[in-house]
Design a protein with these regions (language model features):
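Mid/C-terminal beta-alpha module of Rossmann-like enzyme folds, strongest
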Residues: 14-71
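Non-catalytic, hydrophobic alpha-helical segments
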Residues: 11, 15, 31, 42, ...
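Glycine-rich "substrate-gating" loop/helix at the edge of Rossmann-like oxidoreductase active sites
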Residues: 1-9, 33-35
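Amphipathic terminal alpha-helices
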Residues: 97-113
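Amphipathic alpha-helical segment in the mid-to-C-terminal domain
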Residues: 8, 39, 94-98
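Conserved C-terminal active-site "lid" loop/helix of NAD(P)H-dependent oxidoreductases
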Residues: 8, 64-93
Length: 113
């Protein structure tokens, strides 16, 4: 399943680009990463920034609670947006890389407990 994500500072930067900008008037802009990846790849990226070297296995075992919850979802529809308009028309780009954003999030989560 593919979902578009965006790190909060990057999204805020995109929103700031539209404020008071005549090129943004009456336009809708999507803000998100250029090339969204599936959730397995997201899991691998998170594991990497956490320094976790275990195996990630996909299972549809009905005795696993998480698999039970997933079985009720329609994951055939991808939630993937196209952010080309804000990039091409307003010059948006990510100032925080995906790896840095995940690392900052992991640090923040650890601090919060």
């Amino acid at each position: 399943w593919i979902t578009t994500y965006g790190y909060v500072e990057n999204v805020a930067e995109g929103i700031a680009l539209t404020i008071g900008n005549s090129r943004a008037l009456k336009r809708v802009f999507n803000i998100g990463e250029v090339a969204p990846v599936n959730h397995l790849e997201w899991s691998r990226r998170i594991a990497e920034v956490l320094g976790w070297n275990g195996d990630i296995e996909i299972s549809d075992d009905p005795t696993i609670e998480f698999a039970q919850r997933l079985s009720s979802l329609d994951l055939s529809v991808q939630f993937q947006i196209d952010s080309r308009r804000i990039r091409e028309q307003l010059g948006f780009y990510e100032t925080v890389t995906i790896t840095d954003g995940l690392t900052r999030t992991a640090v923040d989560e650890r601090v919060r407990g």
